[in-house]
């Protein structure tokens, strides 16, 4: 997957108090993703854009669009990525 395709899947990070706490407690970061994106493509897009290994992806459809909760290997990796994308 190239960066253009990955950018069409991962639209933006979703930042709230709850998702901020998820970075610290559950090693998860929440993204707004394309409505037709399946979980394996979301994981591959995160790997392509941010060079981080993904353990798990959970999705939910909301009024804001489709949210993907992406779990990383350790708290350090999730914190580093959150800092890189401007969440922290």
How would you name each of these model-derived features?
Residues 1-88:
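Contiguous, often N-terminal, cationic amphipathic patches that form binding interfaces
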